[in-house]
Amino acid sequence: MLFHLGKSKKSTLIGSTLVAAVALIAAMIAMPWDLEISQWVRLKHIPGDLRRFIHLMEIFAHTLGCVMILSTLLWIDQRNRSKLWKAAMFVLTCGLLANLAKYLIPRRRPSTYDREPWSWLNPDRDPDSVFVSSWDAWGSPLTESWFNESIRSFPSGHTATAVAMAIGLTYVYPKGKPLFLFMATVAALQRLIAGAHYLSDILVSIPLTLLVALAWA
């Protein structure tokens, strides 16, 4: 198999299926409250150095960052070059699929809202504000401009890429699995803090990437 993340193919399949199912269920639960959750997270005070660290970790999910990381590894680790090429192709595939999906399903990014949502998470909200719902962010499939990035929220391409990087690098360097998963988690959190994606966008990207991994296995 291409990616070996467990003691056997069966355990890998079971574990991946469970993670995908939990992520999908969590996404469905979060979806009605996405805008409220996004605002609550963005209003939370995060110490300066920690916030900078979280934003810097976007490199693990950004196309150019991934190219730099994988190119460096391909250059310095000739022994694992074959595996690294497979990992790179896997990351590329996951990123392309996630971005294709977001171009088919329009959804406004949370950072584009200048009105606060009705929210029990925001006790200091202005009672005279015009409120919007999390459902208002969705558009009709294939009806919006393909070049309007402000409506390309669902799913999170960055998260799909970060999870793919964690899986691909774990395939090449199994001992680094905890570090790779940590980096992917922080990269996904960065998308929420930056207002680029809703929580459900991030969660849905996980089973999407796992599905591709199982197809490659």
What are these regions (language model features)?
Residues 31-33, 77-78, 105-106, 194-198:
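Short helix-capping/hinge motifs at transmembrane helix termini and TM-loop junctions
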Residues 58-73, 158-169:
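Hydrophobic alpha-helical transmembrane segments
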Residues 72-104:
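Interfacial segments of alpha-helical transmembrane regions
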